[in-house]
Amino acid sequence: MFLGHRTSISTAIARFKTPAQQPLFSRHTSPRFLDPRARAMSATTSRADPFRPAKRVAGQRQDVWSIVNEAAAASPVQPIVNMGQGFFGYNPPQFAIDAAKEALDKVECNQYSPTKGRPRLKQAIADAYSPSFGRKLNPDTEVTITTGANEGMLSAFMGFIEPGDEVIIFEPFFDQYISNIEMPGGTIRYVPLHPPKDGATRTSPASEWSIDFEELEKTINPKTRMIVLNSPIATLSPELYERTLTVGSAGKAFYATGWRVGYLIGPEHLIKYVAGAHTRICYSSVSPLQEAAAVAFEQADKAGFWDESRTEMKKKMERFCEIFDELNIPYSDPEGGYFVLANMSSVKLPEDYPFPPHVASRPRDFKLCWFLIHEVGVAAIPPTEFYTDANAHIAEDYLRFAVCKNDDVLETAKERLRGLKKYIVQ
């Protein structure tokens, strides 16, 4: 039954009559509020639970985010310093905040935006990215706006993946990619990145993680529909542009992850299907924050924001990684972004440590994560969450830290991590 936007759920239920022209369900929908006939029907269908979840969401093991939150709530060390999740510990630039406030006063910004996004934002993105692509982007046909980069990825997969199509992703991957690909019926093929062989004993550039291209070539086959590259890359030729979708996030760019403003750039013959899928998933995206993001893109260069952002993030990375140098813990030194992987193989966990069963059954990095939260009060993310079980061994000695926090938070985290000294065996 289709419910139009003017039809409330309660009205729709009231219109659904039994043969006796009486509502089958009372106003409340939980089982104990069903009327006697509904309860009888429920009893006869007990073998086929009418409230059973779909397979795409059922039977999933506990995700890393809820495990970290559980550990943080139970830790005797409070408050926890959250260095795990990649949210910013500070506000967007003032020109972006001011633009968001001003947008709320505009009538048109408080109503539905065009399904493909507000024209001002699409123009601002086209202007910002045209130099990088080496061509003048058409904002009407080569840019579309989505509700965050994650929904943009889902729209791209929904727009092109049919059941049985294969998508290649590299490990480590963002865990949302899995459900985004599987929902339209795609099959995932995995190719891992390999750390340097001496990564447990030497701090090395993150660029030394490498792809086995022979392994990649063997994975490509006639069913391969897409390859996902979760890394900054340059478009090297016009031919590559014609078959590439680039996904971006205004929230990540301007320290505003809660805004959920994403975008895709690509040729018209690809973008139109992504936009079509987006329209059917959520119709349109948040209008006032699109306007704010447009102003932010327009003013970023003039305000020197991009250069300042790169400089400040590099300083934060260097500041935080001082603790790893001090503890002689090797790490993958990133050349961009705000995540760092530290190799914790020298941290020896007590053999009798009381890990809960759902942590004890997971790879070593989950135990390291739980241990850090409970013993020193610092939260990190176990990167095997971003690997298949077959390749989890590659990352089980690492932990991921996010440095996009205020400097005082970084200093507190460093001081607490010094508590690991007594557990380190070189």
Q: What annotation goes with each model-predicted range?
A:
Residues M83, K106-Q111, A124-D127:
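Glycine-rich loop-to-alpha-helix module at the N-terminal edge of alpha/beta enzyme cores
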Residues K116-G117:
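Short beta-strand to alpha-helix junction loop
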Residues F2-T18, L24-R61, A72-L104, S130-Q426:
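PLP-dependent class I/II
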